[in-house]
Amino acid sequence: MPKGRQKVPHLDAPLGLPTCLWLELAGLFLLVPWVMGLAGTGGPDGQGTGGPSWAVHLESLEGDGEEETLEQQADALAQAAGLVNAGRIGELQGHYLFVQPAGHRPALEVEAIRQQVEAVLAGHEAVRWHSEQRLLRRAKRSVHFNDPKYPQQWHLNNRRSPGRDINVTGVWERNVTGRGVTVVVVDDGVEHTIQDIAPNYSPEGSYDLNSNDPDPMPHPDVENGNHHGTRCAGEIAAVPNNSFCAVGVAYGSRIAGIRVLDGPLTDSMEAVAFNKHYQINDIYSCSWGPDDDGKTVDGPHQLGKAALQHGVIAGRQGFGSIFVVASGNGGQHNDNCNYDGYANSIYTVTIGAVDEEGRMPFYAEECASMLAVTFSGGDKMLRSIVTTDWDLQKGTGCTEGHTGTSAAAPLAAGMIALMLQVRPCLTWRDVQHIIVFTATRYEDRRAEWVTNEAGFSHSHQHGFGLLNAWRLVNAAKIWTSVPYLASYVSPVLKENKAIPQSPRSLEVLWNVSRMDLEMSGLKTLEHVAVTVSITHPRRGSLELKLFCPSGMMSLIGAPRSMDSDPNGFNDWTFSTVRCWGERARGTYRLVIRDVGDESFQVGILRQWQLTLYGSVWSAVDIRDRQRLLESAMSGKYLHDDFALPCPPGLKIPEEDGYTITPNTLKTLVLVGCFTVFWTVYYMLEVYLSQRNVASNQVCRSGPCHWPHRSRKAKEEGTELESVPLCSSKDPDEVETESRGPPTTSDLLAPDLLEQGDWSLSQNKSALDCPHQHLDVPHGKEEQIC
């Protein structure tokens, strides 16, 4: 067997797959440093070496500015600095990123390299600017709260049904939280010490009208029901990230409270509440109104109406207080919010409700004055509003059961606070216009949508649609104020016409001509109001419809089966917003009919009056504004660098900040009583003292003998102190009894009479005895007193 090389099984065997893989991995391992060292030449976007890097702005030394020339300069400069040119930075011409080749280096070596690079770049004539790149901390703009009930706040962020919420998270991500705005809840009080409200509480905007002190803390009651105001306040401004309960829609705003519903309420108290601290409070949230029983016709009385008007004129430095009111919860009683004077007012923002499925809840009311709707609770199978609650009595500080239009109005108030943060100079009419322009129409089988002449869709069930925080805030950011409020009031139109039963009807007309509107300049409508006086045996059987010149119909007075009042209407004002943006000129028709079964007595339209409110805007102006707002919905204007100038507000005199508290009042009453007591006591003491002096006098009325000297008194050393001042007898035989009231001389001090000069006593005698002197024998001095 010939000699040969001994076989080594492991080496002589054919290379299998595992062996090849090991060789490939070894090769890659050896190539990694080389690859990483050259990776920087691929461009700055993929750079991730972790070492120092510099941004450098170069200009061509040859003056041509060509990109190829600049690229060559950048390569040479980077090499001179011991760096690698990673390429141009984005689309910025002449800007390059220089990076240090990868490799572990001690900290001292890195610092030496940094100094060397800085020296090279600073001394090169082609370098216009350079800067070492630092790591920047950036966070994703997403909203995360640790409040335990925030995931259940579907109305803020509906994860179960995306889109069925108020669309507010994008606004929060841009740091719009209501900062700088104060919302006041006019209700039964606000528990401001609870941790969800305390950090945002505004004591300077608060007051208790029920107890007449500055603290609106709710009082426990038998029904455990005075939590209403606290719940509304939590919806607006509950503090986030405090690991407690929930989050408010405008959690950066201030929240105040006016306690007025926990006791008897008068017209004057309402008036005070509507204007209380109206240079501090921007928005008044009012989740209350007349009884929702389907038979009440009521609203603010004379003082309340005046306060609402004064608030929109002088409140908020002249931009106008924003009054947000709930439309009412009388739907199950077939009630209608046109019979609610607060919802019917042109000075308020009337807000209705929809449930989480976007449908009209069973309790919601309809009316022609409805401006918009937002979310609230529905039937028992649907979720209600999660918000802060009081922790008094049976309260736990948090609730998942807030519902009704009472829950919808505070959400609207919070969204308006977001609007005022980005545009503080919005007027009360600007807010109404933005709601009309941005509310979104949606389908509901109960809603009857009609598009008016100006292109706005409205339904009696949902107003102009659902409030959308994103649309409201973006529109507010670029909004310029509407022109002045123009109005037209017709004469009182006396009719005295019978109202027939259905299907017949009474129709009355009034034409508004161009000449009628010349004085005010009114062109397009906002609110239209009709004031009627009607007698009818059953008020709830009446149906009133108003037709604007365009033909747009408003059901301003809906029949109500539970309203059997026999007095009809006495100067009651109905209003509608359904003709918003339409032309004001033309013929208005009021159509009334009796839909009841009673035929024993006919109703009479005594008189009516038409009032138009609007502006000098034309139809073209409205269309231009619509296009402008739609262009802003991308959010391109919603950043701090863009801001339209705001006109300065009016200098409204501040309110007197001093308040008499009950304790102060009690103290003043006690001090007053004490003062009266001592005054009476002192007067009684003086009176008794004078009577005592008078009883001790011995002066008689009649002839008065004025001796020059009492010899007996002189001898006894008592001078004249024991001698009567006036006597018809000798002083030594003076009688001690008094026969009449004392005279002026009776009350003279004895030490004055003991002096040698008797002119005083003689003069006093003349004062006491003003009658003429009688001629008497020499040596006697007598007078007839």
From Swiss-Prot:
Stored InterPro entries: Galactose-bd-like_sf (IPR008979), Kexin/furin (IPR034182), P_dom (IPR002884), Peptidase_S8/S53_dom (IPR000209), Peptidase_S8/S53_dom_sf (IPR036852), Peptidase_S8_His-AS (IPR022398), Peptidase_S8_Ser-AS (IPR023828), Peptidase_S8_subtilisin-rel (IPR015500)
Record topology, Cytoplasmic segments: 689-785
Gene3D superfamilies, per the entry: Galactose-binding domain-like (2.60.120.260), Peptidase S8, pro-domain (3.30.70.850), Peptidase S8/S53 domain (3.40.50.200)
Extracellular face of the membrane: 142-667
Signal peptide stretch: 1-37
Domain (P/Homo B) ranges: 481-618
UniProt activity-regulation remark: Inhibited by zinc and copper.
Positions of the UniProt region annotated as Disordered: 197-219, 700-751
Stated role: Serine endoprotease that processes various proproteins by cleavage at paired basic amino acids, recognizing the RXXX[KR]R consensus motif. Likely functions in the constitutive secretory pathway.
Name of the protein in question: Proprotein convertase subtilisin/kexin type 7
Species for this entry: Homo sapiens (Human)
Gene: PCSK7
